[in-house]
């Protein structure tokens, strides 16, 4: 699906807020451009955040307008697109525009959603639920494979640890790798403190650098990073998104470490 010698970088804002998403996408392309030989960038954003903590929180522009926006970004920037879906009907519509459709962590056991996502023949990114062990991902994988679609990505995004907390177990990455599909580490949702702010999730972005480096060292194919020009003003996941400025600062180390691990793996084979 992707060049194995390139680090996947699935990056973009949590949700489409307004037309500023175009400028964010353009800026991301500029940031990644110097690393074109080492990084495979995929733009991500959501048209609907269907699992917000509060009914009063912003969800997004909706399916129709959101997919229109993503289609324009895809055409203008010549970039692959990922978005998340929440029902079989949404999966069918999103696959008409997006190269990758994502099954959210909370929905990763929903059989109808997984099967329909597979039937679209798009690449399917399955996010491991916070409530699942890595071994239990065999079930979601089998549901997609039952459609004849083997284009699967597995994303680790942390595991529930008591109330309002997540931990990242790097052993999970090795377990997921053994399924034989590309494994991605979600460096921003992994630092969330779910429900810690009552009507929304908190976050500890200061741990993004160490967790992303650890995941690369553990052997992931890429990183999933939600990013925003000014996270503090973001309409969703403000407490856990990485600023574009910080992404630009961290990217060189990610690429260097990924390249080193690839070289070490080649020697050890």
From Swiss-Prot:
GO biological process, one term: monosaccharide biosynthetic process
Keywords: Cytoplasm, Lipopolysaccharide biosynthesis, Transferase
Catalytic activity: D-arabinose 5-phosphate + phosphoenolpyruvate + H2O = 3-deoxy-alpha-D-manno-2-octulosonate-8-phosphate + phosphate
GO cellular component: cytosol
GO molecular-function term, one example from the UniProt record: 3-deoxy-8-phosphooctulonate synthase activity
Top-level enzyme category: transferase
Domain of life: Bacteria
Enzyme Commission (EC) number: 2.5.1.55
SUPFAM superfamilies: Aldolase
Protein's cellular compartments: Cytoplasm
Pathway stated in the Swiss-Prot or TrEMBL entry: Carbohydrate biosynthesis; 3-deoxy-D-manno-octulosonate biosynthesis; 3-deoxy-D-manno-octulosonate from D-ribulose 5-phosphate: step 2/3; Bacterial outer membrane biogenesis; lipopolysaccharide biosynthesis
One Pfam family this sequence matches: DAHP_synth_1
Keyword Hydrolase: no
HAMAP family: KDO8P_synth
Family membership: Belongs to the KdsA family.
Record's protein name: 2-dehydro-3-deoxyphosphooctonate aldolase
Gene from which this protein is expressed: kdsA
């Amino acid at each position: 699906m992707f060049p194995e010698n390139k680090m996947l970088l699935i990056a973009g804002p949590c949700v489409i807020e307004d037309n500023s998403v175009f400028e964010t996408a353009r800026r991301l392309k500029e940031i990644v451009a110097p690393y074109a030989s080492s990084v495979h960038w995929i733009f991500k954003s959501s048209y609907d955040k269907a699992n917000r903590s509060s009914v009063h929180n912003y969800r997004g522009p909706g399916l129709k307008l959101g997919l229109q926006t993503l289609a324009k970004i895809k055409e203008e920037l010549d970039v692959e697109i990922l978005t998340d879906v929440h029902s079989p009907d949404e999966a069918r519509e999103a696959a008409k525009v997006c190269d990758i459709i994502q099954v959210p962590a909370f929905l990763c056991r929903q059989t109808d959603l997984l099967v329909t996502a597979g039937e679209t023949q798009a690449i399917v990114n399955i996010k491991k639920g916070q409530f699942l062990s890595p071994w239990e991902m065999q079930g979601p994988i089998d549901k997609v494979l039952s459609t004849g679609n083997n284009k699967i990505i597995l994303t680790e995004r942390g595991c529930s640890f008591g109330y309002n907390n997540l931990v990242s177990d790097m052993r999970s990455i090795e377990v997921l790798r053994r399924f034989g599909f590309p494994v991605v580490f979600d460096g921003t949702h992994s630092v969330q403190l779910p429900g810690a702010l009552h009507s929304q999730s908190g976050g500890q972005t200061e741990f993004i650098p160490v967790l992303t480096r650890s995941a690369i060292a553990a052997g992931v194919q890429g990183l999933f990073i939600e990013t925003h020009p000014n996270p503090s003003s973001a309409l969703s996941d403000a407490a856990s998104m990485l600023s574009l400025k910080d992404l630009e600062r961290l990217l060189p180390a990610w690429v260097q470490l990924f390249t080193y691990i690839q070289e070490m793996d080649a020697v050890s084979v």
